[in-house]
Curated annotation (Swiss-Prot):
Belongs to the methylthiotransferase family. RimO subfamily. Residues 4-119 form the MTTase N-terminal domain. It comes from the Bacteria. Coiled coil: none annotated. This is Ribosomal protein uS12 methylthiotransferase RimO. Pfam families: Radical_SAM, TRAM_2, UPF0004.
Length: 445
């Protein structure tokens, strides 16, 4: 393929981002990558098909990119990702402007499909389902140079009643430890300091290929890689957290004292309807244990409100939990009725208006909690990775803050500080979600 201009639009989660980065690396061998789709002759849209709003965004983006065939330089429109995997037949008819469609296991066919279309005009539509394949290899990072996501497993075995991911991504399959370590070593050589481990469920890592959960061993091995400063864990199911994992987080200085626990709900009756493999008691006990064992740990969660049949009593139980437990970070999603899931067939679907009201109530409650938690940080000093500038301020994150989903720390510009540096910042003021501070030196003690 001659050096044709290619742009890739990546939607959805950071697991999708990794697929996009893998595609970019392959494309870069024979194409010129451009950021602006209006300049591109080939446009690739890597879609999300998880919930209704994500599907709408994906379809709108595809249609917008398709319009560039008339208004700009686009000759080839490629659509990939979860939406194509989930709705392969419907999309083909709905959007005839698509020239190439690839499922989540077909990225190795990307370059060849583009070449064939440019030569003959022959369209390609692939959507292979796989319970064995894992997309891995070299990537071109779309994150800042100091941070990278590393996928340690693909797929999911949980089959929660509201979720379509196992039907899209297949069963849970861990990557080999040596492959992950090789990737981390390469990233560290590129200057990456923060490694963020992701999967549909990171806590189950290794169960399928090693016969036991070995996330703690993986953390220990990654921490030995020269250049890695922070290791962050996302998507940790509370019921799968082992004592070995707790010990490793506690004792390993490179592992951020931060855990993302996607509990989704707290009422046992709702958890049962969701098909979750845990209970209210288990969730509360693991939170208590983590706080007791790991000093200064930050806990984040995500909740779903408006699940089918959610009563006022069950919602009040959720509010009481949020108020009593006071998690450091919290996000709320309205239940989305997804085709092909058993929850979509449940009776007592909740009105959208009620969902919105419940979402707002939880967020108002959490805003107050977050404000109080942040006040306690005034006077404390943190290591901060510097991310950028806004007007006359620098901003960055400490170990308590994951990129994009959590707050930031702002501080005055310092001529000795560069983007990507890890420096010490002393907190002087607090807001609901963000902190304000000064670069720590002898004068700011």
């Amino acid at each position: 393929m001659e050096k044709i201009k290619v742009a890739l639009v990546s939607l959805g989660c950071d697991k999708n981002r990794i697929d996009s980065e893998l595609m970019l690396y392959k494309l870069n061998e024979e194409a010129e990558l451009v950021k602006d789709p209006k300049e591109a002759q080939v446009i690739i849209v890597n879609t999300c098909g998880f919930i209704e709003t994500a599907k709408e965004e994906s379809i709108n983006t595809i249609l917008q990119m398709a319009s560039y065939k008339k208004t700009h330089n686009c000759k080839v429109l490629v659509v990939t990702g979860c939406l194509t995997q989930r709705y392969k037949g419907e999309l083909k008819e709905l959007i005839p402007e698509m020239d190439i469609m690839l499922g989540v296991n077909d990225y190795d066919k990307l370059l060849e499909s583009i070449k064939v279309f440019l030569k003959s005009g022959e369209k390609s539509f692939y959507h292979k389902y796989s319970d064995t394949k894992i997309n891995e290899g070299n990537r071109i990072l779309t994150t800042p140079t100091y941070t990278a996501y590393v996928r340690i497993a693909e797929g999911c075995n949980n089959f929660c009643t509201y979720c379509a991911i196992p039907r899209i991504r297949g069963k849970y399959r861990s990557r080999k430890k040596e492959n992950i370590l090789k990737e981390v070593e390469n990233l560290a050589k590129q200057g990456v300091k923060e490694i963020i481990l992701i999967a549909q469920d990171t806590t189950m890592y290794g169960i399928d290929i090693y016969g036991k959960k070995v996330l703690h061993e993986l953390l220990r091995d990654i921490s030995k890689v020269e250049g890695v400063k922070w290791i962050r864990l996302l998507y940790c199911y509370p019921e799968e957290i082992t004592k070995e994992l707790i010990e490793e987080i506690k004792n390993n200085d490179k592992v951020c004292k931060y855990l993302d626990l996607p509990i989704q709900q707290i009422s046992n009756s709702v958890l049962k309807r969701m098909g979750r493999k845990t209970t209210k008691e288990t969730i509360i006990n693991i939170i208590k244990k983590l706080r007791k064992e790991i000093e200064g740990i930050t806990l984040r969660t995500s909740l779903i409100v408006g699940f089918p049949g959610e009563t006022e009593g069950e919602f009040s139980e959720l509010k009481e939990f949020v108020s009593d437990v006071k998690l450091d970070k919290l996000g709320v999603f309205k239940y989305s009725k997804e085709e092909g899931t058993s929850a979509a067939l449940m009776e007592e679907q909740i009105d959208e208006e009620i969902k919105e009201k419940r979402e707002e109530e939880i967020m108002i409650l959490q805003q107050s909690i977050s404000k109080d938690i942040n006040k306690e940080k005034i006077g404390k000093t943190y290591e901060v990775i510097v991310e950028g500038t806004k007007e006359d301020m620098y901003y960055g994150r400490n170990y308590e803050m994951s990129p994009e989903i959590d707050g930031e720390i702002y501080f005055e510009k310092d001529e000795n500080v560069k983007i990507g540096d890890i420096i010490k910042v002393k907190v002087t003021h607090s807001l609901e979600y963000d902190l304000i501070g000064v670069v720590y030196n002898e004068l700011s003690k």
